[in-house]
Design a protein with these regions (language model features):
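Membrane-embedded helical hairpins/re-entrant loop segments and their flanking transmembrane helices
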Residues: 22, 48-87, 266-338, 483
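Membrane-embedded alpha-helical modules
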Residues: 107-226, 344-345, 349-463
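Terminal cytosolic tails of multi-pass membrane transporters
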Residues: 439-507
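N-terminal signal-anchor module of multipass membrane proteins
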Residues: 2-89, 100-109
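Juxtamembrane interface elements at the cytosolic ends of transmembrane helices
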Residues: 6-10, 40-44, 48, 188-199, ...
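Short, non-helical or kinked segments that cap or interrupt transmembrane helices
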Residues: 60, 83-97, 141-148, 205-211, ...
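Hydrophobic, membrane-embedded alpha-helices of multi-pass small-molecule transporters
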Residues: 23-40, 178-190, 208, 248-281, ...
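Hydrophobic transmembrane alpha-helices of multi-pass solute/ion transporters
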Residues: 10-11, 15-19, 195, 210-267, ...
């Protein structure tokens, strides 16, 4: 190999860092936005409804939520020096883990009057998160393909239920639950993605989910569904007319932050759970994109989560985590450029300060997006299974580790009430419900612990523990992208990456 060829190979831009043409960046960024929007605004709606806040106050929370999510996404995708941002194609949004403690804290101090205590605790949890980001990131040393595969698989499986709720409805006792028209449109979106994946090439193949959502939205116009609003019924653009052009609330809108020890402890536990989920998502994206992930990368990504809690506490919002919905989209489309999700972050910021834009996106029927979400969540599961294939299952206890971890982690997902909320640990203390109510957290704890016990302590043999995620080419789980991606698509095969010197197995 000539010196010039070797130089070109060494200086080649990794697909994660590739800057695509502006038009493609915009469309691909919009696709990520459509996928995550329903989840992004769910937290303020649920919290606002539980606390019986006024419509105007809930709208303020939604705007603040989108603004902070946009800032957090920009920080994660673009990065801020050596301090913040994992620099991967990820999207941040409000974590669902914060809902129970946030409602409990606010209700304890008088509903809306208790929000200053919520935001005071959130500020403290953000500081706590920044302090523990570096030591927490060291756990990546104990995430071999065995553990990573289990966690990624659980991420996907635990999201199938929410996808079903998006399609059929969120209350099984509602007379409108499971409408045939909604389910058929969602299936049409799934079929559309498969059809477009089979027939389209290049850029059009990469935006197959977005094209299917658009087609499904048009189809929804002709369904005879009940007029129940954009989130559960068919198209309803009335919210666009009522939305303001500008809607930016001043920091500490609900008053100066106040501090309560129990509230602070609760949200610090939420931060630990958030870090667990974000770490799993970062590992999954690194696996999909072929980008080597070091503990320093994880530290910056977690620090960005901690910073989002500080921003949320001061700007009337919520702590953010990385959205698994968008992790699945990265794998499904094969587009690995982090600048795509940077555009998504910019769009979220715009929606946070221009409510009319957000209201229009919110008008897309939820069952339409649910069809696309179903494929993407299942894709995450497929990536986890693909990762587990790298594990040796003969002459060790790895199969038992996988079986036990999957069984334990899915218990909360399969034991739920009429609204889909897990009730398996409802008799446990509040802190235990927060920690163990997340299948992802249980998966991480179980797989991590069992791997150490069976494969490392006492001379166990099995799966080697690696300090970084192995850099492998990202092969789409479903053929949305052609085997010959279009130039500048960001879907080129990842170059071979050298493992860092620190990447040695545990003794």
């Amino acid at each position: 190999m000539s010196t010039s060829e070797r130089g070109k190979r060494d200086t080649a831009t990794h697909p994660v860092d590739e800057v695509l043409p502006p038009a493609r960046l915009t469309v691909l960024g919009l696709q990520h936005l459509f996928i995550m929007y329903a989840g992004a605004i769910a937290v303020p709606f649920v919290v606002g409804g539980a606390l019986k806040l006024s419509a105007a106050t809930i709208a303020l929370l939604v705007n603040a939520d989108l603004l902070v999510a946009g800032i957090a996404t920009l920080i994660q995708a673009v990065g801020v020096g050596k301090l913040f941002g994992v620099r991967l194609p990820v999207v941040a949004g409000a974590t669902f883990t914060v809902i129970p403690p946030m409602i409990t804290i606010a209700a304890k101090f008088g509903g809306e009057k208790g929000l200053p205590y919520v935001y005071g605790a959130m500020l403290c949890s953000g500081v706590f998160g920044l302090l523990i980001a570096k030591p927490f990131a060291k756990v990546i040393r104990f995430f071999p393909p065995l553990v990573a595969g289990i966690v990624i698989t659980v991420i996907g499986l635990s999201l199938i239920g929410p996808a079903a709720a998006m399609i059929a409805g969120h209350d099984t006792e509602d007379p409108h639950y499971g409408q045939v028209s909604h389910i058929m449109v969602a299936f049409a979106v799934v079929f559309g993605i498969l059809l477009l994946a089979r027939t389209l090439r290049g850029f059009l193949g990469q935006i197959a989910p977005l094209l299917a959502i658009i087609a499904g939205s048009v189809l929804a116009l002709f369904t005879h569904s009940w007029s129940g609003g954009a989130r559960t019924g068919s198209w309803d653009l009335s919210g666009v007319g009522h939305a303001d052009w500008l809607g930016f609330a001043a920091p500490f809108h609900f008053g100066a932050p106040r501090f309560d020890a129990a509230a602070i402890i609760s949200l610090c536990i939420v931060m630990l759970v958030t870090y667990t989920e974000s770490t799993a998502d970062m590992i999954a994206v690194a696996e999909m994109t072929g980008k080597e992930l070091s503990s320093a990368d994880i530290t910056r990504g977690l620090a960005a989560d901690g910073l989002s809690a500080l921003l949320g506490g001061s700007m009337n919002s919520f702590p953010d985590t990385l959205f698994a919905e968008n992790v699945g989209l990265v794998q499904m489309t094969g587009v690995r450029s982090r600048w795509v999700t940077a555009v998504t972050g910019g769009l979220l910021v715009v929606m946070g300060v221009v409510p009319k834009v957000g209201a229009f996106v919110a008008a897309v029927p939820e069952f339409v997006v649910g069809g696309a979400a179903l494929v993407m969540f299942a894709t995450v599961t497929a990536v986890g299974i693909q990762t587990l294939k790298k594990t040796e299952f003969h002459g060790n206890h790895n199969l038992l580790i996988v079986a036990t971890s999957l069984g334990l982690s899915l218990l909360p997902a399969y034991a739920s009430d009429r609204f889909g909320n897990s009730v398996f640990f409802e008799k446990f203390p509040d802190w235990a419900q927060i920690v163990f109510g997340s299948p992802i957290t249980i998966a991480v704890v179980a797989a991590f612990t069992l791997n150490l016990v069976f494969n490392h302590l006492g001379g166990g043999v099995g799966s080697p523990a690696l300090p970084v995620v192995p850099a492998v080419p990202a092969v789409p789980a479903i053929a949305v992208v052609s085997a010959r991606p279009a130039p500048g698509s960001g879907a080129a095969s990842a170059p071979a990456l050298q493992r860092s010197p620190a990447a040695s197995p545990l003794p």
